[in-house]
Amino acid sequence: YNNIINEITKLYNADSAGSYEPLTDDEKDKMSDTEIEKWETKIKDSLLRRDTSLGTIMNSMMTAMSSPITIDGKDYSLSSFGIQTLGYLNAAKNEQNAYHIDGDEDDENTSGNKDKLMDAITKNPDTVIDFMKQLSTNLYKAMDQQMQSSSLRSRYKIYNDKELDKEYSNLTKTIKQWESKVSDKEDYY
């Protein structure tokens, strides 16, 4: 989860390309290969900045992970087991949505905290198992919901492939019409 949410957050919060536009051949001729590569990387890195589909997926994942789960009449969340994010102020850039386990010796941010997860596993393993099963199910359902078929996209796609296909067909048709008009004009003259 952490690797995925960190990557999504990084892509979503990417720096703006600002005034960077694709380079023309003339502009490329005046630049070194390194300069061209940096320029194009800046544009590519910002392609998914504030992308609505990516934002929706990110929000769905975060909601699934943070929603309380009721087991035997009691509500639990990840924080009940000492698993929580560091938040915007304490986390590294684009890692504010990643979860950390209190008492984890390998995590310098939370290693000094009490290990609530181990306590819960020792005292009531069935509750922890039930919670984790339900959490996994909730996350799966949230992602499945995002990948449902719609008038704009096919099932298991998170981008609007049907819409893109329709736009591609329309543009191809328009290009053919203009090519035909140009050909007719050339034949006329």
Task: List each language-model region with its residue ranges.
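Low-complexity, Gly/Ser/Thr/Pro-rich intrinsically disordered linker/tail segments
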Residues: 186-189
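Structural flexibility/helix-modulation signal
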Residues: 3-176, 180-181
